[in-house]
Amino acid sequence: MNDYYDAVIVGAGIAGVSAARTIRELNADMSILLVNGEDRLPYKRTKVSKHIRTGYQKDEFALYPSEWYEQQGIELLSGELATDIDRQEHTVAFKGGGSVRYGKLLLSTGSEPLFPKVVRPHESDSFFVVRHAKDGERLLKSAQRAKTVLISGMGVLSVELASELSAMGKDVTLIGATAQLIPKQLNLRASEILEDLLSRKKVKLFFQEEILSFEQNKKRRMSVQMIRRSGNYDMVVICIGVQPRLELATRAGLETNRGIRVNEYLQTSDADIYCAGDAAEHPNGYVTHLWHAAEYQGVLAGKNIAGEPAKHDYPPFRLKAEVFNTYFFSVNKPWNPLDYEIEEFEEGERYWALFYKNGVLSGMVMVNDRDRAQEFERAVREGWSREQVHRTFAFA
């Protein structure tokens, strides 16, 4: 490791890797250090929850092989954590000792799981989360012995885990504070389709329910008290959401709120420090937790660091999930659908909900029309008219 790099990137998720790749594409000479806090090559994190049943090799989901980083002249520092930033000296210090100086710094530190108020993170031996590959490995190891599993959360991750664990023959109970499944990305009808699917696969669902307390009993099972029920489970999995990782930015005195505050060029309150991905809070208060949004922000940050100004223009990004071989897709589903004109179509096992604003397609939700998913995403991004949507997709 050198003493100085033109660009130091802290965090090797998709935002960090995309930034490093973009810098190199635009500038062959800039020195780049990519700090990877995990014990493996940077990987596609969204693959983990989809492969709990089958398991996975250490670098199975790697974004690029190790040789790629060498070929690109990107120095990859794995298994190391950044602990402090000295903005005046332009240095980053590491947990393992030592520090480096930077010209420009990118924080792509991502997010971390939220915990119920009754749970403290240091009690992590008592429950499971799935954020990183090691989390999935730990969960899979324990799931081999478990018979009953309680999952707290109604989002995409919770549903994917319920699908995987149920397919392993586990007795799965899914609870959450919301009144429907995946409420941020699915409309009511799509959630009903998903609910019916899970129920047919014997996944127990309890809405508007939360964990009040849990502790290990004499039989080494978890005794869980909820609002309206109680039960004993071999495993408890917490999936109630994530929050931006702010500790490094906070210690450095950068402006933070829900996330690390950035401008339209992804600069923080320090012009030489950028932030991209799950940790960034944009001028409109927007904080994303979508893979492709983080990838896009990484590209923008890379351009800006390389000296090619690029503004964030907030394009919509898709979310997809496959549950028991049923494909769910959402792009830019509105928070308040009452402000939109809505068209719904249902044909056998397929379903579409189209949201129009001033005659223009603004968002959509779809079930089991995978082959046209990319075209649907393009239609939303380009703001197709109702006539173009009907003509292209043959909606009656």
Question: In which residue ranges do the predicted regions lie?
Answer:
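Rossmann-like dinucleotide-binding cores of NAD(P)H-dependent redox enzymes
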Residues: 62, 148, 156-213, 312-328
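C-terminal catalytic lobe of FAD-dependent flavoproteins
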Residues: 222, 233-255, 329-396
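FAD-site-proximal beta/loop scaffold in flavoenzymes
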Residues: 123-144, 223, 230-300
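Beta1-alpha1 glycine-rich phosphate/pyrophosphate-binding loop at the start
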Residues: 2-75, 164-185
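Mid-to-C-terminal Rossmann-like scaffold of FAD/NAD(P)H-dependent oxidoreductases
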Residues: 2-5, 12, 25, 279-374
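A conserved short coil-to-beta-strand element within the FAD-binding core of flavoproteins
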Residues: 79-89, 207-219
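Glycine-rich dinucleotide-binding loop and its adjacent helix/turn
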Residues: 109-168
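Short hydrophobic core segments
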Residues: 10, 100-110, 233-241, 298
